[in-house]
Amino acid sequence: MKKLYIKTFGCQMNEYDSGKMADLLHADEGMVMTDTPEDADVVLLNTCSIREKAEDKVFSDLGRLRELKKTKPHMLIGVGGCVASQEGRQIVSRAPYVDVVFGPQTLHRLSDLIAQRRKTGLSQVDISFPEIEKFDHLPASRQTRGSAYVSIMEGCSKYCSYCVVPYTRGEEVSRPFDDVLTEVAGLASKGVKEIVLLGQNVNAYLGKMGDAEEIADFALLIEYIAEIPGVERIRFTTSHPKEFTQRLIDVYAKVPKLVSHLHLPVQHGSDSILSAMKRGYTALEYKSIIRKMRAVRPDLTLSSDFIVGFPGETDADFEKLLKMVQELDFDNSFCFIFSPRPGTPAANLSDDTPYEVKLKRLQTLLALIEGQSNQISQKMLGKTERVLIEGLAKDGVNLQGRAENNRVIHFSPPDQNIDGLIGEMVDIRITEVLNYTLRGELVETHVI
């Protein structure tokens, strides 16, 4: 039986794509996953190009795989994802021992590329953008319980000045409405309880409805998914403030299955920086969205993405960012120092802010958000949370699950039928706040 190893870099879209690669090669060649490249017949790197030096990390990994391939000449090496899309044949030029290179839109052709490599002995490269045809050629997910990703669209058409996504994943293309519902219904019928809707900009979703000319927006899609039997919880990522409509806010008011946690990237709190980033909204407009959201969901927790040290950022700009964070009370968020990405407009902007200043700003922002996050954790102490059990914690003893607000909670398992709890919803009373997790005790064991 052939074995497959996949190393995934970056976002949830890549995690979803890696799962589809595994499903595809299992269906076509009977491959099973392994935890180490040393045991694998096929090794795939599913790459991300969002952060600086992403390419260097990939080629560093490829260098280690080259040494492994010397001892296992039959092993095939593939590079997928956004670095593959960005670099293309340059990957094979720099690392001729790489067998296949494929982009996010051509992963459905992976089996064919591998077959061609074996047949011809030549490295295969396909980084084309055949819109969204890949979903017509991928097998159904093998996920049978717990939480599952469902991609509803691909690409992004916003062209923020610092971002490579439109160049590596293409323009926004939405999956047909019925196709998404069919996939969700199939997962729910297998025992999946939580659906996570994925896209670079999910709230730009506009899916064709059947053979009619009607188009479904993101709000309507959520309403329909909430009606599918077996679906107990709905999440989504990532959304864009520019298209966070009143219709979507209204859905939060009437669809309780949609979690009270929102990840809405703001990137900055200064209008001048937001304009330079080409984000398409002001700080006040972002604050207005959150105010409306908390009017319909008072218990909403908010996380975001922040970039500090963007070219031209002054002390006054940074103070505006801190003021926004203080006003809106963010939970755990992703904070980065700006890193120029080749080929983006922001890479050409003048940047004379010393790195030490940027680092200090980052540390200040992180400390502020960490303090807010800890306050949110403390408020959960003593409360009972509905938790979806994901599996064993890293200690191999406790179970861990995720609350509606996305917090990870550890608890001691019952004496019997631990496996029966995995993928189920249970009630956990929070008893302790730790650095990055919460600890609790099982209240309900209805599945045992």
Curated annotation (Swiss-Prot):
UniProt-recorded Gene Ontology molecular function terms: 4 iron, 4 sulfur cluster binding; metal ion binding; N6-isopentenyladenosine methylthiotransferase activity
Radical SAM core domain: residues covered: 142-375
One of the record's GO cellular component terms: cytosol
EC number(s) recorded for this UniProt protein: 2.8.4.3
Chief location bin: cytoplasm
Disulfide bond entries: none
Binding site for [4Fe-4S] cluster 2: 156, 160, 163
Occurrences of domain TRAM (ranges): 378-444
Family annotation (SUPFAM superfamilies): Radical SAM enzymes (SSF102114)
Subcellular location: Cytoplasm
Catalysed conversion reaction: N(6)-dimethylallyladenosine(37) in tRNA + (sulfur carrier)-SH + AH2 + 2 S-adenosyl-L-methionine = 2-methylsulfanyl-N(6)-dimethylallyladenosine(37) in tRNA + (sulfur carrier)-H + 5'-deoxyadenosine + L-methionine + A + S-adenosyl-L-homocysteine + 2 H(+)
Keywords: 4Fe-4S, Cytoplasm, Iron, Iron-sulfur, Metal-binding, S-adenosyl-L-methionine, Transferase, tRNA processing
Domain MTTase N-terminal: 2-119
Quaternary structure and interacting proteins, as annotated: Monomer.
The family this protein is said to belong to: Belongs to the methylthiotransferase family. MiaB subfamily.
Role noted for this protein: Catalyzes the methylthiolation of N6-(dimethylallyl)adenosine (i(6)A), leading to the formation of 2-methylthio-N6-(dimethylallyl)adenosine (ms(2)i(6)A) at position 37 in tRNAs that read codons beginning with uridine.
Designated name of the protein: tRNA-2-methylthio-N(6)-dimethylallyladenosine synthase
